[in-house]
Structures are given as structure tokens and as C-alpha cells.
């Protein structure tokens, strides 16, 4: 294995390109960026030196909406009507999921995210204690939420409350600054107002985040209005779920007033363009309204079964192109804003720092190959990163100063892939045996 | 260099996966698939053996609409209104293009296409004799058209006719079965009916293809109706340009009758989803109408300045997702049809064989990494290829039985990238000096 991956200590990235200039980046033992510039090397006595020539440094990417362990369901079923896909394919398989599956699937998802430049993610699923173990092993950051679904049933709600409290206690007990916990009320169509209210109060009391699906489909909006007399964002707001600690995924069918409401409450809207296109939700997130209102808009891949990958570099292209196409404006969401979405906006959402390459920020750093085909010619690095490259251009990934990948090598990759394949096969076998 | 790349002769791909079965593929000295199956190895005494374990074989991809040398303009200007982008950025730069630039840019484009699994492409640009030299050097197949633009001026038309005739004579003189020539009337808004008629007659006389842009924007349709009293497809038909040898790019704004007309004439419609989204053309190709009419629908990346890459694996995902989103149907353009678009439909369009892995077909073969993250788990290879993978999963590429890439190694890659970067820099410098 490359010794740069196994070494620990302070670190210097020498002669790397940032915004067209060649600089050094010094990272101290705590994993904080200590200096950036031509003289940065003088500020530390680096234990590790990474050659930054032919490399472009960008902040580590942040995936603000996924269901990581669903990597095991990649390609299991596609090209179906949403309801058939869920009821005939996804749910019957998920009924057989074990904690071991979630560990294998989350570890595999972390591998995929690291290989495409992601350092932190916002996750919602089940067996999240095992997801935490996987994140810990892989050295990434994550905010983990148990998917809270009460379907309006009090008994189920009590069980979900317990599951949520158990996860929060577990993650707190880990005392790992890279791993955070959030409350995960699934959506207004799967959680009762009572459940939503409990989630909001508990999140406030615990000072933790809220991770929720919002206005993914038109049906969600229509049903919500029919049932509660108000649109989903207003229902969430009534229940106290719209806070600066809230990440609302999808947000396709928000109207303009709801966009203003999200901005006023400090909510982050997570754009998930590939999933929205694949599932044909028939409307792209109104980014222009959210932007005009000053909302924080971040980027997410959604789970592997509705994307079908976790490559946030690719997702930036889908975001920038979908916004242009859906809202009929070739100038909407230019490359620089797409990168901001995938970095700083995500970091703000998850509270993992500024999400920029600045002194004092956590050293969450991605090095892209400046000699890659997709980076040639190199007129505008932002344009190439968004429109031409995918995760394959990512060469090195640092999270809090620790090297998770170097020259595309991630420790244990073969074993992680093999175990994910075995877990997926076993899951399908068990589901078929029982049917 | 890997000896499998330099070796010449008959070839065996041993133990490779096709449609879930493990088989051998035997390729004879002429580059034709001689046998496929468990006993294929017995049919030839192979000079070269490629280990197919952990590899999935698919037909080589065919890119049916691009402007290859525009790889030099990748990322030069983005996120602009189409007319500003062309008049302020692209055209001023193109005015300084030389034959050497086109050679460097096309060779670089070939490298990018090979690295993402493309074996053949349909090109339209200038200095196409130099493009032919690049294609020859790189071992790919291409159909080359000079972009014919008369703007209604007779003098210009005469010059375009001469340029077209010169290119046709040049390509014929090469006598290279991998390199074909076509007539390239740019579009109904840049070529007069007289010019279109000449193109159609000359193509018929020479028995060569026609490569044209069709109904990319609403403005094109509106202007055509105002000027000629008919929609673009009907104007092209009146001029004789709709033939089984015709590839019409974009086709976003076709109405249902035009889709039937294209099908009746045997025209191939080339879908270019990423370009259409990036330039915000406001309507996706009506694939459902073309499919219902029985038209041949293929896939293309368009040029690098409006995509911004030539990765047809990525383009399959854009096609499958854009169709679902734009026409509000999660079942439209399933994975298998996206692969058909990128392989067999393209091969039919360019006359390069069936575009399938079948005995007697040219050995245009791509080997994908079955152990890649994007191919794990491997429930459905088609789904993974379209929705999860990009060109990075392509390990080996054969064109007419010749190995163009093996284990991601392409001969001369570093030099080709370096020369493209230098050519792009020099082009911009010359343009700036003259402004």
C-alpha cells in the first residue's frame, strides 16, 4: 500500500493548483489547514509530503442526501413505475435486510464516495449503528438518521421514537467528531403531524439535525393539501421541522412562497437531480426561486437504487444541466455555483466547516488530475470539474487531514467490493427463499 | 507497452461474460468475429489471448453526432446564451483554427472516445482531411463530413461544393475501410434549398451518407415555417435529404408527423441529450414518437464545447434519464434500449455492421470491468452500464479485431494529451493576438 495512506501526522501538499495559482497547503496534526501559499511549507515540519504537481485542489465534496446501504440494491430493479418499483421490488428485499448487510453496504458506499471525491454524507436508513461502524472504518464524515416512519399509527410511532433515541445515544457514545446523528422524519406522507412534532422537539432538545424528504412528487403536494389543507413545507413548519439544522431532500414541487419560507427558516434544500429524472418526478427543484430567496442549496445523489451511483462529480453535471433544461435558461446554475452546491453549501448544511480551502478549515481536500483527458485543455477548472469530468478524475482524498485515497488507491478496496457483492447476493437469495 | 496492444493476428477473448453467460470469443485475422461460445477457442489458433475473466463484453459504442476537433475548446466558454456563446466565443476562436489544430484535436477526441468505449463516430467539421489522418492513426472508424454552410450565397455555395468534393475525393483515395465520408449540409437555417438539393444529389450519386442538424431549437422550426412555409423535416425532404443514409442530429422539436416521415425515409435520428440540456433547447427529442414510428434512433455526444465530454457511457445515462424526465414516464427508454441506441442503432446508421456481438460481425468489442464499483452488485449488466458506470469502467477496446486499448492503456496517450493542450493554448493565443 502507498505509504502516504498509512502515515499519520502533519502534511504538506506541495505545488498544487488552486484557482489557477500554484501553492502549498500545510495541514497540522489535528487535520486543520494551517497555511496556504508559496511559503506554507515553512509553517510546519511536515511528516508527509504529497506532490501536488499536475493536481488541482478543490474542497472535499459533501453528499447531503443518500441512503448509503442501498448500494447493495444497485441495478436490482429499474425502469418501473415508482409505486410498483417500491412495492414489488425494493420493500420485499429491504424486509430481509440485516445489520450486517447495512454494514457491508455502507462501507461499500463509502468506498464509492471516496473514489469520487466525497468526504461527508447525510444518510437516512435502518440499522444505523452498523452504518456508523462502517463510516468509522472508512474515515469519512457522516450525519446518520434513522428513517422515522409512523404511518399515523401510535404504536409504530412509539417504536420509531425508541429507535431514534437509541441511535442518538449510540452515536453520542462513539464520541467521534466525524460521526454525527440527526432525526430522520421520512416525509409528510409517511409521518403523522404528531410524529413530526416529536422529531422537531427532540432534535431541538438534542441540538441535532433533521433530515427529511420534501415535495419530491406532485402527488405528495396534492395529497398533503387534501389531507391537511396546506402544502408540505407549511405542514413541516407548523410541526417545527424547518430549522437551520434541517436538510430537506428533493424539493422539486416547492412553490415560490415555500422557497422563501425555507430560506427564512435557514433550511438547506438538497438537490437530487439524477434521482428526480430517473423517477420522472416531472419538475426540477426551482433553484432560481431558492437562490433568489437566499436559501442554502446543496447536492445529493439519493440512494443507489434510484440514481444508480454515488458519484457527486457526475451529480454536479446533472444538476447544472437539469436546471438549464427544466427552467429553460442556459445561464442558470453555472459551473461555479454547482461546485459551491457540492462543497460549501453541503458543509454548511452538515456543520462540517466552511467547505472551502481556507486557513483554519478542516483539511477536507480533493486532488483532481490536471492531466486527465477531462481536464485538457484547462481553460476553466470549474467548468471541467462540472461538465467534463466524473469521479474518475479524483486522485487523492483527505478528510480532516487523513489520506483516505491516494493515487486512486483505497485500503481494502477489493475486499470491500467482494463483501458487498456477497451481501447483495445473499440478500436476494433470502428474499427469494421466503417468497 | 502491453504486448496485447502491439500484437497483430487472430485473437481469443477467453472466459468473458456476455448476457450473464461465460463464453469465449474468437476473432479471425481479418478482424471478424469467427465464433462465440464455450468451444469458440477450437475454431482458431489464436495469436493473441485476452483474459476475459472479470470482464463483461458489449458491442463497441458508436457516437453518431460530434465535432471531434472541438475537444480543443472544452471549457473555453460555458453557461452563456447560445447566440452570445457562438458569436463572442466559439466563432472568433474557430476563425483561427488550422489543419494542425484539427489533427491534434481529432486525435485527442479519438483518445477520449476509445477510453470510454467508442469505436466509431460520425463527425462534422473543417479541415477534415486532417481529421481523417487522426482517425487513421488512432485505429477507429469514422464517417467524416465537411460542414457545408452557404448562408444562401451562391459564391459561398460554390466554395462549399468544391470543399465537399475535395474531401470526398481525398477520403476515397485513402482506401481505408475504417474511414468513410459523408456530405454535411449543416442545417436548414445555414444552407439554402439549392445547397441542400446539391448535397442530396451528390450524396446519392456518390452513394455516401448525409449528416445534418435537424430541429435542435424551437427558433429553427419557427423561422423555417416563416421562411419556407413548412417545418424543417419537410424542407429537408423536399430537397431530397431524408434517406436511409441520413443521420439527423438533435431532432428535439420534431412533431409527430415529422417523426413518421423520418421513419418512412429510413433516416437515423441521433439523440444528443447532454448538449440539448446544456444549451437549454427546452424540449427533449420525442423518442416515444420516433420509436412508435419505427425510426432508427442512435446516440451522440455533440462536440466537447457543448457537452463537455465525449463519454458515450455517460451519454446513455443522460438519454435514459432525460427521456423519463422530459416526457414524464419512468418506463421510457429503459437500459436495454439505451444500449441499443449507443451500439446497434449507431452501427446501422454508419453502416459499420450489425453493432452486435454475433458471428460474422466486425470485432468491435468493449470489455467492461465486472469487478468495478459501478458493476457491483451485478444484478443486471445493462442497468449498471447505463445508470451506474461511466467510461471509466471500459478496460479493453477492439475495433475490427485490433486492440486500441487494453487495461486502460492507449499507445501514446501522454503525448496526445500534451499536444492537444499545446494546440488549444496556441489557438487562444493567436485569437487574442489578432483581436
Regions found by a protein language model. Name each.
Chain A
Residues 74-140, 163-174, 422-432:
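Alpha-helical scaffold segments that flank or form the walls of functional sites
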Residues 16, 31, 54, 65, ...:
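Divalent metal-coordination and catalytic microenvironments
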Residues 72-104, 111, 138-153, 158, ...:
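Active-site gating loops and adjacent loop-to-helix segments of metal-dependent hydrolytic enzymes
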Residues 1-23, 27-34, 343-435:
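Active-site microenvironment of metallo-dependent hydrolases
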Residues 130-252, 257-259:
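Metal-coordinating catalytic core of metallo-dependent amide/deamination hydrolases
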Residues 218-230, 258-263, 280-290, 307-324, ...:
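Histidine/acidic-residue-rich catalytic or RNA/ligand-binding cores of hydrolases
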Residues 238-245, 287-372, 386-390, 398:
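His/Asp/Glu-enriched, well-ordered alpha-helical/loop segment
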Amino acid at each position: 500500500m502507498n505509504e502516504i495512506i498509512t502515515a499519520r501526522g502533519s502534511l504538506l501538499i506541495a505545488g498544487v493548483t488552486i484557482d489557477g495559482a500554484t501553492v502549498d497547503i500545510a495541514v497540522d496534526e489535528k487535520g486543520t489547514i494551517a497555511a496556504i501559499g508559496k511559503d506554507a511549507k515553512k509553517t510546519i515540519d511536515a511528516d508527509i509530503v504529497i506532490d501536488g504537481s499536475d493536481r488541482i485542489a478543490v474542497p472535499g465534496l459533501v453528499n447531503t442526501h443518500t441512503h448509503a446501504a442501498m448500494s447493495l440494491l444497485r441495478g436490482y430493479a429499474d425502469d418501473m413505475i415508482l409505486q410498483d418499483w417500491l412495492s414489488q421490488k425494493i420493500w420485499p428485499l429491504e424486509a430481509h435486510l440485516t445489520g450486517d448487510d447495512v454494514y457491508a453496504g455502507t462501507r461499500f458506499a463509502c468506498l464509492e464516495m471516496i473514489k469520487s471525491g466525497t468526504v461527508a454524507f447525510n444518510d437516512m436508513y435502518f440499522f444505523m449503528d452498523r452504518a456508523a461502524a462502517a463510516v468509522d472504518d472508512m474515515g469519512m464524515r457522516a450525519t446518520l438518521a434513522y428513517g422515522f416512519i409512523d404511518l399515523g399509527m401510535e404504536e409504530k410511532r412509539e417504536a420509531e421514537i425508541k429507535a431514534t433515541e437509541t441511535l442518538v445515544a449510540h452515536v453520542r457514545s462513539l464520541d467521534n467528531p466525524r460521526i454525527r446523528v440527526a432525526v430522520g422524519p421520512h416525509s409528510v406522507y409517511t409521518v403523522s403531524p404528531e410524529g413530526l412534532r416529536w422529531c422537531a422537539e427532540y432534535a431541538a432538545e438534542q441540538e441535532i439535525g433533521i433530515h427529511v424528504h420534501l415535495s419530491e412528487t406532485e402527488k405528495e403536494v396534492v395529497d398533503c393539501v387534501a389531507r391537511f389543507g396546506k402544502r408540505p413545507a407549511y405542514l413541516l413548519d407548523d410541526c417545527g421541522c424547518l430549522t437551520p439544522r434541517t436538510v430537506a431532500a428533493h424539493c422539486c414541487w416547492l412553490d415560490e412562497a415555500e422557497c422563501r419560507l425555507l430560506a427564512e427558516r435557514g433550511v438547506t434544500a438538497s438537490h437530487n437531480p439524477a434521482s428526480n429524472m430517473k423517477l420522472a418526478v416531472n419538475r426540477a427543484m426551482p433553484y432560481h426561486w431558492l437562490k433568489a430567496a437566499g436559501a442554502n442549496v446543496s447536492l445529493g445523489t439519493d440512494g443507489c437504487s434510484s440514481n444508480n451511483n454515488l458519484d457527486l462529480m457526475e451529480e454536479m453535471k446533472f444538476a447544472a444541466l437539469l436546471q438549464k433544461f427544466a427552467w429553460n435558461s442556459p445561464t442558470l446554475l453555472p459551473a461555479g455555483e454547482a461546485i459551491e452546491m457540492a462543497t460549501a453549501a453541503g458543509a454548511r448544511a452538515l456543520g462540517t466547516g466552511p467547505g472551502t480551502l481556507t486557513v483554519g478549515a478542516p483539511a477536507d481536500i480533493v486532488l483532481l488530475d490536471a492531466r486527465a483527458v477531462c481536464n485538457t485543455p484547462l481553460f476553466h477548472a470549474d467548468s471541467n470539474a462540472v461538465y467534463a469530468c466524473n469521479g474518475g478524475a479524483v486522485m487523492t482524498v483527505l478528510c480532516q487531514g487523513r489520506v483516505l485515497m491516494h493515487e486512486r488507491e483505497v485500503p481494502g478496496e477489493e475486499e470491500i467490493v467482494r463483501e458487498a457483492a456477497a451481501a447483495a447476493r445473499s440478500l436476494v437469495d433470502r428474499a427469494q427463499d421466503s417468497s
